[in-house]
Amino acid sequence: KNTVVEAGGYDPGTIGEDMELVVKLHVYCRENSIPYRIRYATDAVCWTQAPEKLGDLCKQRRRWHIGLFQSMMRHRRIFLNPKYGLVGLISYLYFLVYELLSPYIEVFGILTIVLAFAVDLINVPFMILFFGIYVVYSAILSLTAFFARIYTVDLKLSFSDVLKAIGLCVVEVSCLRLVLAWVRATALIGYRRRKHAWGRIER
């Protein structure tokens, strides 16, 4: 708690308060030569309001992307700066490429495929096969994370629950992910007006 207060606490100018605080702690400890270790508490219990509608999910992901952008811009001095260790050399680069810029890469890729299809420059059977492999592989990754979490908290699932999880993972990869990629790609439109907007989620 003392370190959080000394580092400046939560920044009221951001809406991604959790990530911003963690990065701020890294920067503060590095700049002040304070030995530290930030770990993930697997047994921590916290409650959050999960969106139940697609519109609310889009608001949440838009807020997350804006919060990510704000945090990375505030701490851009650590980018590839060896003074900040692996956080600046690897973690920042990861979040820049695979989180902040990835929706733009995804949307560009989709538009490229549509254009190639329109001008008959695409091998349709190969594209379908490739997309199928992508869906199966991504669904397996999601299911692995899901079942690992189920195992660690010792929850019991029925066979129907397992089938639902498999179906939802396939839908998430093949449909929902594309929708959320568009939401994230357009999140910064009107940024000045919405940079402090939390976005209300219906209970």
Which residue ranges define each predicted feature?
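Non-transmembrane catalytic domains and loops of membrane-associated enzymes and transporters
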Residues: 1-85, 93, 97, 202
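Residue-level recognition of short, well-ordered coil/turn positions
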Residues: 3, 121-122, 195-196
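Intrinsically disordered, low-complexity regions enriched in small/polar residues
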Residues: 12, 42, 136-139, 193, ...
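Membrane-embedded multi-pass helical conduit in multi-pass membrane proteins
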Residues: 94-192
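Membrane-proximal soluble regions of multi-pass membrane proteins
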Residues: 56, 60-74, 165-203
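Membrane-helix boundary/interface segments in integral membrane proteins
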Residues: 84-87, 120
